[in-house]
């Protein structure tokens, strides 16, 4: 018996996720929130001026969701992005890597024309 996979017809109102929040990143954030002992915490990802390439990424925990925040949930973890940062992060991937160089959150951003060697700074 042959099976043929058919692509689902996308809903015209369907909007792609603004960014990818990997399982690895969500699981690490969940672990950090559990260590803090405050289940109300959410991970806020933001872009601000600075760094050697003009913009830099930032991460912080926040209990509050602002009116202009975009919210994503993965594996029970909420990710917040403010409206200014959102425009720079659309299409990006937030991951958590552990390797010989250590452990860190990594953002792969298709909007960045150049990135710094440290990986936390970029320009558009």
From Swiss-Prot:
GO function term, MF aspect, one: iron ion binding
Alphabetized Gene3D superfamilies for the sequence: HesB-like domain
GO biological process, any: iron-sulfur cluster assembly
Cofactor: iron-sulfur cluster
Name of one Pfam family that matches: Fe-S_biosyn
Keywords assigned by UniProt, alphabetized: Iron, Iron-sulfur, Metal-binding
UniProt cross-references to InterPro entries, sorted A to Z: FeS_biogenesis, FeS_cluster_insertion, FeS_cluster_insertion_CS, FeS_cluster_insertion_RrpA, HesB-like_dom_sf
Disulfide linkage: none
Record note on cofactor: Binds 1 iron-sulfur cluster per subunit.
TM annotation in the entry: none
Sequence positions that bind iron-sulfur cluster: 52, 116, 118
Known role: Required for insertion of 4Fe-4S clusters.
PANTHER family for this protein: IRON-SULFUR CLUSTER ASSEMBLY 2 HOMOLOG, MITOCHONDRIAL
Family: Belongs to the HesB/IscA family.
Subunit relationships: Homodimer.
Protein name: Putative iron-sulfur cluster insertion protein ErpA
């Amino acid at each position: 018996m042959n099976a043929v996979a058919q692509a689902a017809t996308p809903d015209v109102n369907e909007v792609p996720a603004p960014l990818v929040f990997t399982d690895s990143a969500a699981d690490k954030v969940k672990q950090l929130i559990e260590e803090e002992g405050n289940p109300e915490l959410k991970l806020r990802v933001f872009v601000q001026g600075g760094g050697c390439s003009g913009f830099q990424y930032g991460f912080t925990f926040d209990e509050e969701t602002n009116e202009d925040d975009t919210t994503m949930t993965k594996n029970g973890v909420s990710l917040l992005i403010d409206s200014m940062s959102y425009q720079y992060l659309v299409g990006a991937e937030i991951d958590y890597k552990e390797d010989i160089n250590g452990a860190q959150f990594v953002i792969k951003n298709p909007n960045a024309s150049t990135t710094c060697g440290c990986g936390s700074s970029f320009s558009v």
